[in-house]
């Protein structure tokens, strides 16, 4: 599965292609002017028809019986002869592209549309248009299409089709066979199928506005595919309503918004999977009451050709050649491929390219290997994000467990604005930002400012350093108070005072790590985890170490800090002040058994200068030194060897005699 970032190149190609097929602002303005003018003119035609019908009423029609008048009122309460005009097709869906700008309107009639009504509207429409604008339009009727065709006389050339229809046509077809139609159709009734298609187009436009317009990249992909249908004859049968259904189902079923390139690839994957082929799931028409296949008009050969073409396009896209599918030139890489200019000649004149930058480029200030790290750290410190992040962390330490709430989300999809709030001591603070995280950071800054805490980075560092000083002072007092009593209560108080609230490392007075310094004085110490408390946002660990029979505890936000706190407490108790000299002289030597124990004790006596050590006689133990070495305590005064330095050996180094074990004869075998 390709990662989300790998579709960035496809997105660039799709958006560039989309910009070339999208209508220009002049064309869109011409479309808007023409459609608005015709809609307003049809409204005036409807008013003129109503006035004409009222003027032709006879006096006898006004003297009908009350019951007949009630029936006529119930029949004529629909109102106007022309009920309204609605946009359908590309205008309503926003799918106009260059060289394919078919404009369509539906003129809804109260009664079934007839040829007489069509002629009446056609004759009066130019008169009403002249009252609205000075532009010239050509108006002609098309009885076979049940429509009126309107064309403009200047560039860009546009054609607008106004189709007449009525809801009564569909209601009549949906009646059961047992019901009789009381009214007879007029002889000059317009084509019934054309009127039904106009009603279906109206339903399609409403469905598209409700389902597909809100999907990210859906309209863009539809424009790209409509251009593909115009360029490639194989895709022409899919153009229109089936293509819109496929795109909506393909993109709408994804659990996240898709970019233009990934959305186009997803549509191609659906078509390449064989949904159009016989035996496949088909394509359900959601705008029909009865189960209807939207692909029923296509032949099997057409479906196979489209599937084959989609598979080929999918392969090209997988190999980074989507520009071939879009029939455009490949775009250059967004990142520069070469950072340095390569030299093509060397000193000897042979043609060779330098594939690496010259060594001199790396000299100067970049000699320090940590130069890049320092430069990046400086950039981070100069940014404002560190201030906001520190503010959020400090607020979480001061008031842990605060609940941030999302109040609102406004703005367009490409530039949203989130508003977050938090309740602190009954006061609600609000802030906005381009993301939820940024809005939370802004809220934290407001809360800290209201509480009187500094929010700058330098102020945070000063505050943290003061916390360290106060912690160290409290540690000294607590350790001195716990020296006489080593009970559970005292250790609890010690752990509470040894908590480290800063994120910096814990160091001794000499600038060393407490754990390392304590390990130098007492090796083999074991640290045990006593307790672990707090939630995920505020963990507290308590570590314990035993040194010379005394136990010391330390606490911190993690095990490392708690371990360092415990080691620091032990150092301050045992190796600082008057106890430092006594503890330094202590040497705990592990007891050994048997011959090795005797050798160790003898070596220690020799080092201390208490006389020449003696070795007990034991099996396989000899006092002779190995070649090149002199055993300490044998042949040299005071137990030091001639190879030792003039200033002597370290005080705590344990010197062992060299023991030579007899070697047994090893059999040698030779094979011939």
Swiss-Prot record:
Residue spans of biased composition, Low complexity class: 477-497
Location of region: Disordered: 52-73, 349-371, 466-499
GO molecular function term, any single one: double-stranded RNA binding
SUPFAM superfamilies: dsRNA-binding domain-like
Keyword DNA-binding: yes
Subunit structure: Interacts with EIF2AK2. Associates with microtubules; it is unsure whether such interaction is direct or indirect.
Designated name of the protein: Spermatid perinuclear RNA-binding protein
Organism whose genome encodes this protein: Pongo abelii (Sumatran orangutan)
């Amino acid at each position: 599965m390709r990662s989300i970032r790998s579709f960035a190149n496809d997105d660039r190609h799709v958006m560039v292609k989309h910009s070339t097929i999208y209508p220009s602002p002049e064309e869109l303005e011409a479309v808007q002017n023409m459609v608005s003018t015709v809609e307003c003119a049809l409204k005036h035609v409807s008013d003129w028809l109503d006035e004409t019908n009222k003027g032709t009423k006879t006096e006898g029609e006004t003297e009908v019986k009350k019951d007949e008048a009630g029936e006529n009122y119930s029949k004529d309460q629909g109102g106007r002869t022309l009920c309204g005009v609605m946009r359908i097709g590309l205008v309503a869906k926003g799918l106009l592209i260059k060289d394919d700008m078919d404009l369509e309107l539906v003129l809804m009639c109260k009664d079934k549309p007839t040829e007489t009504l069509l002629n009446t509207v056609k004759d009066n429409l130019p008169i009403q248009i002249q009252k609205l604008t000075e532009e010239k339009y050509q108006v002609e009727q098309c009885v076979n299409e049940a429509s009126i065709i309107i064309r403009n006389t200047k560039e860009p050339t546009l054609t607008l089709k106004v189709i007449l229809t009525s809801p009564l046509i569909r209601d009549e077809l949906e009646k059961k066979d047992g019901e009789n139609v009381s009214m007879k159709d007029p002889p000059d009734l317009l084509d019934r199928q054309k009127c039904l298609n106009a009603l279906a187009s109206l339903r399609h436009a409403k469905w598209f506005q409700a389902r597909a317009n809100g999907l990210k990249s859906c309209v863009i992909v539809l424009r790209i595919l409509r251009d593909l249908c115009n360029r490639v004859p194989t895709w022409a049968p899919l153009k229109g309503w089936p293509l819109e259904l496929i795109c909506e189902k393909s993109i709408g079923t994804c659990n996240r918004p898709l970019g233009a390139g990934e959305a186009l690839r997803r549509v191609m994957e659906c078509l390449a999977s064989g949904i159009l082929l016989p035996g496949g799931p088909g394509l359900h028409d959601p705008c029909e009451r009865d189960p209807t296949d939207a692909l029923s008009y296509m032949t099997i050969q057409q479906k196979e050709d489209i599937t084959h073409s989609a598979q080929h396009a999918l392969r090209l896209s997988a190999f980074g050649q989507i520009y071939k599918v879009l029939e455009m030139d490949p775009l250059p890489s967004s990142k520069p491929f070469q950072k340095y200019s390569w030299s093509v000649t060397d000193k000897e004149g042979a043609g060779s390219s330098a594939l690496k930058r010259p060594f001199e480029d790396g000299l100067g200030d970049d000699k320090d290997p940590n130069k890049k790290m320092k430069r990046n750290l400086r950039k981070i410190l100069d940014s404002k994000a560190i201030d906001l992040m520190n503010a959020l962390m400090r607020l979480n330490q001061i008031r842990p467990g605060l609940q941030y709430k999302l109040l609102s989300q406004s703005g367009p999809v490409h530039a949203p604005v989130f508003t977050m709030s938090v309740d602190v001591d009954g006061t609600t603070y609000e802030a906005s930002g381009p993301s939820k995280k940024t809005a939370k950071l802004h809220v934290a800054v407001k809360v800290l400012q209201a509480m009187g805490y500094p929010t700058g980075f330098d102020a945070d560092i000063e505050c943290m350093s003061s916390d360290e000083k106060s912690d160290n002072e409290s540690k000294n007092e607590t350790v001195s108070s716990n020296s006489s009593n080593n009970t559970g209560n005292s250790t609890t108080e010690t752990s509470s005072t040894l908590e480290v609230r800063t994120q910096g490392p814990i160091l001794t007075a000499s600038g060393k790590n407490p754990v390392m310094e304590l390990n130098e004085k007492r090796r083999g110490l074991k640290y045990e985890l006593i307790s672990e408390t707090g939630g995920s946002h505020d963990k507290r660990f308590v570590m314990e170490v035993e040194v010379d029979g005394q136990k010391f505890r330390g606490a911190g936000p993690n095990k490392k800090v708690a371990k360092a706190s415990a080691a620091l407490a032990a150092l301050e108790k045992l190796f600082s002040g008057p106890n430092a000299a006594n503890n330094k002289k202590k040497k705990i030597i592990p007891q050994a058994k048997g011959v090795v124990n005797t050798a160790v004790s003898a070596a220690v006596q020799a080092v201390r200068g208490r006389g020449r050590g003696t070795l007990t006689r034991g099996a396989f133990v000899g006092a002779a030194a190995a070649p090149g070495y002199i055993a300490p305590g044998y042949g040299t005064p005071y137990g030091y060897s001639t190879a030792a330095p003039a200033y002597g050996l370290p005080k705590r180094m344990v010197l062992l005699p060299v023991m030579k074990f007899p070697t047994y004869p090893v059999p040698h075998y030779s094979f011939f």
